[in-house]
Amino acid sequence: MILDEIVKKRKINIAKQKQIKSLAKLKQEAEALPQNRDFPLEKALTKQDINFICEVKKASPSKGIIAQDFPYLTIAKEYELAGASAISVLTEPDYFLGEDKYLQEIAQNVSIPVLCKDFIIDEYQIYKAKILGASAILLICAILDDETLKKFFTLAEKLGLSCLVEAHDENEIK
């Protein structure tokens, strides 16, 4: 299953990142940043009209490379001008060709909330999302047990990040 492959690759990638910058150092940097307790994603999604979270992604396992020339910043700004409520930025590098700089630069250049869309399996990724400027993170029930989901949700909230929780069926919701 593709999800299992992605998670396996993320574990390898995160282990390499931890060799470059330790979890303790990343945590210290993230906790030193201002904690936005306004939770802008929730506020952005309370408009009476339809709310859109528009996605910025270079590639996907099903479609391959979507845009060889990938003007991610232009795309994000156009979404904002078109009335998007928030922007979702793929940061997963192996299957979606995401990069941290996409999230960081978009967050610095738009005024709407920015969601870090990754396959979050380690608290390291949550601290990193905060440092990169995310307003929110994606938590996927299919790859997290209940205890880890709650732990990550609490950590994100402590850092001032909103959580968008993805569930695929009734059992994952329970």
Can you say where each PLM-predicted feature lies in the sequence?
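Conserved residues at the C-terminal ends of beta-strands
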Residues: K9, L90, I140
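Alpha/beta enzyme core
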Residues: I66-L90, N109, E123-A136, L149-T154, ...
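Alpha-helix-loop-beta-strand connector modules within alpha/beta enzyme cores
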Residues: N36-I53, L97-F119, C141, K150-H168
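An N-cap/entry alpha-helix motif that binds or orients negatively charged groups
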Residues: I2-A67
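Glycine-rich, proline-tolerant flexible connector loops at the mouths of alpha/beta enzymes
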Residues: A24-L33, S60-I66, S85-I106
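Short, small-residue-enriched loops and turns at beta-alpha junctions
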Residues: S60-G64, P93-L97, D122, I143-D146, ...
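Short, cationic motifs built from Arg/Lys/His that form the positively charged side of catalytic pockets
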Residues: E55-K57, A107, C116, Q125, ...
